[in-house]
Amino acid sequence: MQIWPHKHIHTLANFSIKDYESVFELANRFDALKNAGTKKIPALQGTLVTSLFFEASTRTKNSFELAAKRLSADVQTFAPSSSSLTKGETIIDTAITYSAMGADTLVIRHSSSYITFEIAKKLDAINSKTSVLNAGDGLHSHPSQGLLDIYTLIKFFSPQTLNPEVLNSKKILIIGDVNHSRVARSNLWALSAFGADIILCGPKALIPDEFINFLKTPAPNQTEDPVKSRGSITISRSLEESIKTADAIIVLRLQKERMMENLLSSIDSYSLDYGLTPEKLSLNNKEIPILHPGPINRDIEISSKVVDRYPNCLINNQVANGIPIRMALLYLLQKHNK
């Protein structure tokens, strides 16, 4: 395994193929240990992981905390409503405070895009050894979700060898609210790195035409793309046509909390055109995998029948795979700092 090059993890835009492979290799090891009955190992014993979540979360927050505990790290949690934020303290000063308490890694979720870059820059300026791990920042990025999604697809398409190259030329259909989705942006970086051809499907209000050029937008302070050749992005407005040739589908939630009022004419019309149902799935002659990062809006973007009855609905697999992926990220950051 290569020496891990990142002190902080903000985005997948600056991940190389070797970076992905390092994460997946470790995740495979941790998953194998769990399957063999070993649920806890002393890999991060004596380290402190601090969970700073300024937005609501079920899957990501609890998955990161469980991942840290399985590595034997101490876990420190944070409640915004009972913190000094209510007295006017800034998020950056809050992060510096937890770093001063000895946090080795800050796992941060916040509604502001690029906030983890700002926090990391401040910490580095005071020579802090604390790493920052982005657990979702505004509309920008959700690296661990992008990693666990691609890991779930790799395990589906290549269960014996777990070879990421299996995604090369696969047609991955992403349906729904791409414009407000940090998950979608991370998926675009991750899937394209392994040569997947990505189809974005939804109305123009949720998938503007400029997303066709998304992969030409680097991360802050990034001068070049570490991936030499990426897959493609196309945009479709017809779910029925797109579904016919798809090898996998990722459904996205309508993020009404981030939308401008009246962005969509109606939820019912959106569901009629772009909701994933058994009838629409029947247009594809393969039993393709279905993913959704959660939380689900049942019978809006995805039918309950698909969630509960479709044999290759991998939503629970995604949740399970999130733990070894996040274990790998926490472990790699600590090894970088030693």
Curated annotation (Swiss-Prot):
Its EC number is 2.1.3.2. L-aspartate binds at residues 87, 182, 253. Pfam families: OTCace (PF00185), OTCace_N (PF02729). One of its GO terms (cellular component) is cytosol. Carbamoyl phosphate binds at residues 59-60, 109, 142, 145, 294-295. Keywords: Pyrimidine biosynthesis, Transferase. The keyword Cytoplasm does not apply. Disulfide bonds: none annotated. It comes from the Bacteria. GO terms for molecular function: amino acid binding; aspartate carbamoyltransferase activity. Pathway: Pyrimidine metabolism; UMP biosynthesis via de novo pathway; (S)-dihydroorotate from bicarbonate: step 2/3. GO terms for biological process: 'de novo' pyrimidine nucleobase biosynthetic process; 'de novo' UMP biosynthetic process; amino acid metabolic process. It is an enzyme of class 2 (transferase). It catalyses: carbamoyl phosphate + L-aspartate = N-carbamoyl-L-aspartate + phosphate + H(+). Catalyzes the condensation of carbamoyl phosphate and aspartate to form carbamoyl aspartate and inorganic phosphate, the committed step in the de novo pyrimidine nucleotide biosynthesis pathway. Heterododecamer (2C3:3R2) of six catalytic PyrB chains organized as two trimers (C3), and six regulatory PyrI chains organized as three dimers (R2). HAMAP family: Asp_carb_tr. Belongs to the aspartate/ornithine carbamoyltransferase superfamily. ATCase family. This is Aspartate carbamoyltransferase catalytic subunit. It comes from Prochlorococcus marinus (strain AS9601).
